[in-house]
Regions:
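Conserved N-terminal/central alpha/beta ligand/cofactor-binding core
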Residues: 1-49, 185
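Flavin (FAD/FMN) cofactor-binding core of flavoprotein oxidoreductases
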Residues: 28-32, 143-152, 294-311
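A glycine-rich dinucleotide-binding beta-alpha-beta segment and adjacent secondary-structure elements
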Residues: 52-55, 255-333
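A conserved short coil-to-beta-strand element within the FAD-binding core of flavoproteins
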Residues: 52-70, 76-91
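Short hydrophobic core segments
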Residues: 102-118, 130-131, 183-186, 325
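Glycine-rich beta-alpha-beta "Rossmann" dinucleotide-binding loop(s) and their flanking helix/strand
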Residues: 118-138
Length: 333
């Protein structure tokens, strides 16, 4: 990644004729919003490099083909019989498909992706090949994924999309992610671009407690929000509590906010005390959703975990377990 960072990736695609755009959260997409454009650019790039594809739509690999690597020779100087530093005991000389056909090669590059979103072809095949060569796997878990919450309020607001809000992810009370953008309430928890970005910062959920804290009005300070609420309530003086929130919050959130606020829904806006308005300010600026789990691998954008990077040379991406075997991309941890 140091030699080929995201900026160079963008330069590559632009050189291949793909016009790019950068959206909030530093997310990069083709201007056309068509994934097919990326696919075609990569196919052209491969064709220009004289890459030849197997005729099968999908090549099912059964195993890597290893051969024993000769032991390093001793020094030719008899007075200093030091052995050369021992390297991998195996050399990868190809792969074998489930049909039994062998593909012999000077080098094998495993770039099969992770195990998330299997409908795109990422079915975890590369992990099996890596293990055959003696590699250790870091347990694959979903990343860039929706988050599951047992909070019943999420289901009550299912389908509500929030724009221009700030999501802060708290780990044991400490902020580990903070970003402004869009998110969505679902029947199982929260989703959307902000949620996906936040999910990549989650650690071991068995060891830590996570809370998503949402600032529904990040453009306003607490004092500015208090003044805004006071003005709204003055204009809607004879409205009940929920009706008084009509200018402040989306309709599907209004009854949920009143319930969490703990105020009698029949209370008129002109009866709401200063203290109650302060409580409302805190709820709007610090709406909390407990996070109980990550979404499943089948719907994750990427996989965290995979082939241990300790067993791969970072300069060449060659396996430290078998010469001629290389790894690239999401198959790695």
């Amino acid at each position: 990644l140091g030699a080929f960072p995201p900026a160079k990736t963008m330069e590559l695609f632009e050189a291949l004729g793909v016009e790019l755009k950068v959206e909030r959260g530093r997310r990069v997409f083709p201007v056309s919003d068509k994934a097919e454009e990326i696919r075609q650019a990569l196919l052209r790039y491969a064709q220009d490099a004289d890459i030849v594809y197997d005729g099968a739509k999908k090549l099912l690999l059964e195993e890597v083909v290893p051969e024993a690597e000769p032991a390093p020779a001793a020094s030719e100087n008899p007075r200093h019989p030091k052995k050369k530093k021992a390297g991998p005991a195996l050399r990868c000389v190809g792969v074998r498909g489930v049909s039994g056909r062998e593909y012999r090669a000077d080098a094998v590059l495993v770039a099969t992706g992770g195990v998330s979103y299997p409908t795109t072809g990422s079915t975890g095949d590369g992990y099996k090949l890596a293990q055959q060569a003696g590699h250790t796997l870091v347990e694959p878990v979903p990343s860039l994924v929706s988050l599951v919450s047992r909070d019943p309020d999420c289901k009550k607001m299912m389908g509500l999309a929030l724009k221009n809000v700030t999501l802060t992810l708290l780990e044991d009370g400490k902020a580990i992610f903070d970003e402004q953008g869009e998110m969505l309430f679902t029947h199982f928890g929260i989703s959307g671009p902000l949620t996906l970005s936040a999910s990549s910062h989650l650690g071991d959920m068995k060891k830590h407690r996570y809370i998503a804290e949402i600032d529904l009005k990040p453009a306003l300070s607490e004092e500015q929000l208090y003044d805004r609420i006071t003005r709204d309530f003055a204009l809607l003086a004879n409205h009940a509590a929920q009706g008084a929130l009509v200018k402040l919050l989306p309709s599907s959130m209004q009854p949920v906010m009143v319930a969490r606020w703990g105020i009698d829904p029949a209370t008129k806006a002109n009866q709401i005390t200063r203290e109650q308005k302060r409580e409302l300010v805190q709820l709007v600026k610090h709406w909390q959703v407990s996070i109980d789990a990550r979404g499943d691998l089948a719907h994750a954008v990427i996989t965290s975990g995979g082939v241990s990077v300790r067993e791969v040379d970072p300069k060449t991406m060659q396996s430290k377990k078998a010469l001629g075997l290389y790894f690239a991309g999401e198959v790695l941890d």
